[in-house]
């Protein structure tokens, strides 16, 4: 198999491992040249063949990569993003909750503009983002994003302080506010609302409702938008990652699609 592009994965958690596994299973011509971690002295299982461990963003310059893919959590976005973009590498972001910080988002956009690299925001657990983005070329009046997940998927988050997750017997709304506030308060579960917002009418106009449902087995996203284009109603019922119920399989799949599209001769 010939290698047509080298990438760096930032993070070796559930999403990073799943992306690497999918690329290997599909015999992709993309090579993972390095995996960025907090501490390279700690042992890591199932690293991609030939990948080296790095822990400092300054090490990106010597990696030979053209794309850096972040899947390590919100704190990693700025240091790794700035290092990648300022070096001329494209940077794909998984932890989009970082963009509730307008100054951070602007710094990355400025770094991309200065070097000519691209700041890439994949669809995360969603589909149809291209349609919402296209619709935003005209006036959009409203966008609502409803996120319904199994009660256990909200464990360990602020949801546990708002609703007794172990006791509810039916779908329970525990949060309704702007996308900015949702993604800031629930960075793992609701960061996808940032993608909806950036494609549509922004973080402060997009409304988000969060629901814990003890009967749910899938992670569900409903997006309703209205505007000059007409009306859009999107619904996705995603299987959770086997190793992390807070994330969807689709998140990893959309990252793989974005990576493979860079080397594909036909792009859909």
Swiss-Prot record:
Coiled-coil ranges (or none): none
Presence of the UniProt keyword Cytoplasm in the record: no
Residue positions binding NAD(+): 125, 191
Active site location: 221
Pathway: Cofactor biosynthesis; NAD(+) biosynthesis; iminoaspartate from L-aspartate (dehydrogenase route): step 1/1
Family: Belongs to the L-aspartate dehydrogenase family.
Name of the molecule in the record: L-aspartate dehydrogenase
Species name: Brucella anthropi (strain ATCC 49188 / DSM 6882 / CCUG 24695 / JCM 21032 / LMG 3331 / NBRC 15819 / NCTC 12168 / Alc 37)
């Amino acid at each position: 198999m010939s290698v047509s592009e080298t990438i760096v994965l930032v993070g070796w958690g559930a999403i990073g491992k799943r992306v690497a596994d999918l690329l290997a299973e599909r015999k992709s011509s993309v090579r993972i040249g390095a995996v960025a971690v907090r501490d390279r002295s700690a042992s890591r299982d199932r690293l991609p063949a030939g990948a080296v461990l790095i822990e400092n963003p300054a090490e990106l310059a010597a990696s030979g990569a053209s794309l850096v893919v972040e899947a390590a959590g919100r704190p990693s976005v700025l240091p790794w993003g700035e290092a990648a973009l300022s070096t001329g590498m494209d940077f794909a972001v998984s932890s989009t909750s970082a963009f509730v910080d307008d100054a951070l988002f602007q710094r990355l956009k400025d770094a991309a503009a200065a070097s000519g690299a691209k700041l890439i925001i994949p669809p995360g657990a969603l589909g149809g983002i291209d349609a919402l983005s296209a619709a935003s070329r005209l006036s959009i009046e409203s966008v609502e994003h409803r996120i319904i997940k199994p009660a256990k998927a909200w464990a360990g988050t602020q949801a546990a302080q708002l609703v007794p997750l172990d006791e509810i017997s039916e779908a329970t709304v525990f949060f309704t506010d702007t996308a900015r506030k949702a993604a800031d308060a629930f960075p793992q579960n609701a960061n996808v609302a940032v993608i909806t917002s950036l494609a549509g009418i922004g973080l402060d106009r997009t409304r988000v409702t969060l629901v814990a449902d003890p009967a749910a087995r899938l992670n569900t996203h409903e997006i309703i938008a209205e505007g000059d284009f007409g009306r859009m109603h999107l619904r996705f019922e995603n299987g959770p990652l086997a190793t992390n119920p807070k994330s969807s399989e689709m998140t990893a799949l959309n990252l793989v699609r974005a990576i493979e599209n860079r080397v594909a001769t036909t792009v859909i």
